[in-house]
């Protein structure tokens, strides 16, 4: 069972927040929503499609909605991508627009929120939490 306002999918709960936050602030915000809350981790194409639809249906249209944070970012000085999501789960599904490392990952509106794009972690974007 999900909290009011959250959407259920295969045992997890999701909510799109129409607040613009940096990646770090968005992750912190998600952890404050519930004990096991984090920015969304996408583990399959099925989950990716669910999240894309949820974002498309719930995002408020502004100039800040081109991107939505997900729970993945570069963790070390060599700019390698973290080997796990912000919730600690392993990365076993990927859907990059292009294979390059900037800093933090988001979903891009142009791809109907289905492809991952590298973004500057300090930019404020909307985000989706998962518990």
Swiss-Prot record:
PROSITE patterns linked to this entry: C_TYPE_LECTIN_1 (PS00615), C_TYPE_LECTIN_2 (PS50041)
Gene Ontology molecular-function annotations: toxin activity
Chain ranges of the C-type lectin domain: 9-130
Keywords on record: Disulfide bond, Hemostasis impairing toxin, Secreted, Toxin
Compartment annotation: Secreted
Gene Ontology CC, one term: extracellular region
Annotated InterPro entries: C-type_lectin-like, C-type_lectin-like/link_sf, C-type_lectin/snaclec_domain, C-type_lectin_CS, CTDL_fold
Secreted keyword on record: yes
Tissue and organ expression note: Expressed by the venom gland.
Bridged cysteine pairs (disulfide): 2-13, 30-129, 104-121
Keyword Secreted: yes
Highest taxon, organism lineage: Eukaryota
Similarity comment: family membership: Belongs to the snaclec family.
Function: Interferes with one step of hemostasis (modulation of platelet aggregation, or coagulation cascade, for example).
Subunit details: Heterodimer; disulfide-linked.
Further information: Shows greater sequence similarity to the alpha than beta subunits compared to other heterodimer snaclecs.
Protein name: Snaclec A8
Source species of the chain: Macrovipera lebetinus (Levantine viper)
């Amino acid at each position: 069972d999900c909290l009011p306002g959250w959407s259920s999918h295969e045992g997890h709960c999701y909510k799109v927040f129409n607040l613009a936050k940096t990646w770090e602030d968005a992750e912190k915000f998600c952890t404050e929503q519930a004990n096991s809350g984090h920015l969304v981790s996408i583990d399959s194409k099925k989950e990716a499609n669910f999240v894309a639809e949820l974002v498309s249906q719930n995002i408020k249209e502004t100039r800040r909605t081109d991107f939505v944070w997900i729970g993945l970012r570069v963790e070390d000085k060599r700019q390698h991508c973290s080997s796990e999501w912000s919730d600690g789960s392993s990365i076993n599904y990927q859907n990059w627009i292009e294979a390059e490392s900037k800093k933090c990952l988001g979903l891009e509106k142009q791809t109907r929120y289905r492809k991952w794009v590298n973004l500057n972690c300090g930019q404020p974007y909307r985000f989706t939490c998962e518990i």
